[in-house]
């Protein structure tokens, strides 16, 4: 807890966000990824927090006047009620609206200039963004729990630019936090989708690549043992991706040795 609190304060101090008030609850209920997301929110933003859970992030940002208003949305009623109670406990109910909806379905484009989607799988994030093409005109702060490679590939192929990535350590693995806006991107390779397009200077990148390679190796082993007709082609594709990741890691180590 103390290590987490120190990291939280470091993130938030860099962004000139005071580290007090709801921070104790905030760190108890959220990991480094969410704390880093808070530091990325522009001063004076209007925020939509999709899948808000207990509402710690929008409440914290409102309490310290980082944002002018916030929308907390969730597909389930119970977490949204938790968010209401959090907002009431910290006296920010006037600055926050609550929406019971899937993704951004009940949020109008003019209501937010910054959209935060965190704590869900990359495939779910893709579906949310598909249903809200107006997000190309917004700042996106994204933290996929799984399938980050699918999210990266989809973003660059559908009118978004990944502008920044940062790795944060969760309980058992590393997670990527991405920022994205609308724009044209160059196509990325499968290896880039797995290891990130803006992570070469991250001190945790080598470890992240190792995690990705291990995941791909397990997938290749599973395919090899399967009875799928196209397994050889798919295994070859996975192994080629692993080889490219190994090359990228070697270049990274040479540059950081």
Which residues does each PLM region occupy?
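S-adenosyl-L-methionine
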Residues: 1-18, 24-43, 59, 73, 77-110
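Class I S-adenosyl-L-methionine
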Residues: 2-9, 105, 111, 123-257
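Class I SAM-dependent methyltransferase "Motif I" SAM/SAH-binding loop
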Residues: 27-28, 51-55
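Conserved SAM-binding motif I beta-strand of class I
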Residues: 49, 69-74
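Short glycine-rich anion-binding loops that position phosphate/pyrophosphate groups of nucleotides
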Residues: 53, 120-123
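Conserved S-adenosyl-L-methionine
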Residues: 63-69
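Short SAM/SAH-binding signature in class I
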Residues: 112-119
